[in-house]
């Protein structure tokens, strides 16, 4: 997969600035609600019908019964009916700004840009702020060319929980909270408890928060050496970093946080370091065209997860270090993969095509005996529209190609340590600390292999209508499947799955 970003061009330095502003709201009247008077009338009719058909009352007595009981179901506050949609939703807005500078000469080209986005959501306290930057530089010197790319971003998102529990119920309460409920006390302060479940979503909104911050950086450097004419040697190093932090707070005044407040912090971090060494050759000899490549690749990935929670705060400074009691959970995983690969493509007159590829991958997710897997493919194509015997129909059939391919690829286990015995310390049974098995070793686990062949036909008529036909068959062998494991032996995987991956069965698909 090749991702191309914006780059500079030879010529004068170009400075560009753009900005835009806008507004947003609900596109439709989602879940239309009755106003207070209409709801009161509907409930009054229901009470009257109850008296008529259940209490066997006369029409007049049923109406009196409804008048006597309507205040219990749809009383009108002295301040008027409450429009919860109006209180909880608003018109959102956004503003975007972008500045870029680019330029260069015959040896050096550069491009850099910064951008800022600020959005206010249609729910109060909901919004997003994003800052991004991008820079790339290309410089040629002698037989060398160096390319440097750097991208980074920081996103801060204020969220609101749309659940219907005490964990910050905001949005959903707009659709089933009674207009008879009053969110404010007589002195103008927020009412702590009203309506359905005794929850005031405005009060909960002010005493809870959910902030997610994501920081990402992607940096690459590539050095290319022109050994001879069409023969090039390149080395590329890429580092990808991402860290997301989610801070969720229910203070001591909220329903969920009472009486001492609860704060949770979840941190996810992903690091990936990739290297690519490639020797490539691209050339043409008359009608003969060759594209060949040899490569060596490495991938080093690390994932870290941290969960921290604090509660019983003595005051209103909600940081984990101030909590009366804390708990934590951590998880760290990593894996590496090394690959050797080769590819060769040949075509004659852009009419007859032949392609070959081969690679062997070694993954740390498998035991040493089964770590390496070899995969290959062969393909061919015939652009028959260029044949002279089709000249009479070329005014209608403007393009045609026949394709055929066969290949083998592999899938590694999703679990980083499926081949190893794993143990975990912690509270295991009846509140007692101890150690349990959380991973049963399977040193025989190996690559899942997919063998696929395909035949296809591409047709184009009068340069306007394109038709593609494909038929394929794929057979998967050594299928990786999570096999149930007996709990009698004390196995505990932490997710109550009680499974271990095995290579069992095969699968065939065609279509």
Label every PLM stretch briefly.
Residues 5, 103-105, 116, 139-141, ...:
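Residue-level signature of outer-membrane beta-barrel architecture
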Residues 16, 100-102, 113, 136, ...:
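Outer-membrane beta-barrel architecture
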Residues 1-18, 94-96, 109, 115-120:
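A beta-strand signature from Gram-negative outer-membrane beta-barrel systems
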Residues 368-372:
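Short glycine/threonine-rich loop-to-helix capping motif typified by GTGT followed
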Residues 19, 114-120, 354-363:
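Transmembrane beta-strand segments that form the barrel wall of outer-membrane beta-barrel proteins
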Residues 87-91, 101-105:
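Outer-membrane beta-barrel initiation region
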Residues 98, 274, 337-343, 351-353:
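Short glycine-rich loop/turn motifs
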Residues 9-80, 121-128, 132-216, 234-338, ...:
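Surface-exposed loop/interface segments of Gram-negative outer-membrane beta-barrel transport/assembly proteins
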């Amino acid at each position: 997969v090749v991702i191309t970003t914006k780059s500079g061009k030879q010529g004068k330095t170009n400075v560009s600035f753009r900005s835009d502003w806008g507004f947003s709201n609900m596109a439709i009247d989602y879940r239309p609600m009755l106003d207070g008077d209409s709801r009161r009338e509907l409930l009054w009719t229901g009470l009257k019908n109850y008296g008529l058909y259940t209490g066997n009352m006369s029409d007049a007595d049923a109406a009196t019964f409804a008048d006597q009981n309507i205040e219990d179901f749809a009383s009108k506050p002295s301040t008027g009916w409450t429009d919860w949609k109006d209180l909880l939703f608003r018109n959102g807005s956004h503003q975007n700004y972008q500045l870029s500078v680019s330029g260069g000469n015959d040896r050096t080209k550069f491009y850099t840009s910064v951008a800022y986005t600020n959005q206010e959501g249609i729910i109060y306290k909901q919004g997003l702020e994003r800052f991004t930057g991008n820079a790339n530089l290309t410089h040629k010197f002698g037989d060398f060319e160096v390319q440097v790319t750097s991208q980074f971003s920081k996103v801060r998102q204020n969220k609101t929980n749309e659940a219907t529990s005490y964990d910050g119920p905001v949005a959903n309460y707009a659709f089933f909270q009674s207009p008879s409920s009053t969110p404010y006390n007589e002195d103008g302060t927020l009412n702590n408890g009203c309506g359905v479940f005794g929850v005031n979503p405005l009060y909960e909104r002010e005493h809870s928060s959910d902030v997610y911050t994501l920081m990402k950086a992607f940096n690459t450097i590539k050095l290319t050496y022109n050994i001879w004419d069409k023969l090039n040697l390149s080395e590329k190093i890429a580092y990808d970093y991402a860290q997301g932090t989610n801070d969720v707070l229910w203070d001591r005044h909220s329903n969920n946080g009472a009486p001492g407040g609860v704060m949770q912090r979840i941190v996810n971090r992903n690091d990936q370091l990739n290297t690519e060494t490639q020797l490539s050759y691209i050339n043409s000899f008359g009608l003969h065209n060759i594209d060949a490549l040899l490569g060596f690749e490495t991938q080093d990935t690390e994932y870290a997860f941290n969960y921290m929670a604090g509660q019983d705060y003595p005051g209103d400074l909600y940081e984990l270090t101030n909590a009366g009691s804390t708990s934590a959970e951590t998880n760290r995983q990593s894996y590496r993969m090394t690959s050797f690969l080769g590819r060769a493509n040949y075509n004659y007159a852009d009419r007859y095509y032949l392609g070959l590829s081969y690679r062997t991958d070694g993954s740390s997710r498998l035991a040493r005996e089964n770590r390496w897997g070899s995969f290959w493919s062969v393909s061919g194509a015939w652009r028959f529209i260029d044949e002279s015997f089709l000249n009479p129909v070329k005014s209608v059939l403007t393009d045609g190609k026949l394709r055929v391919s066969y290949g083998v690829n592999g899938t590694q286990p999703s679990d980083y340590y499926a081949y190893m015995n794993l143990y975990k310390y912690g509270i295991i049974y009846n509140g007692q600390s101890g150690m349990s098995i959380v991973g049963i070793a399977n040193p025989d686990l190996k690559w899942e292999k997919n063998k696929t062949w395909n035949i296809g036909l591409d047709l184009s008529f009068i340069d306007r209508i394109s038709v593609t036909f494909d038929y394929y068959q794929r057979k998967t062998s050594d299928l990786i499947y999570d096999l149930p494991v007996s709990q009698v032996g004390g196995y505990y995987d932490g997710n109550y799955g009680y499974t271990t991956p095995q290579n069992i069965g095969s699968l065939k698909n065609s279509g």
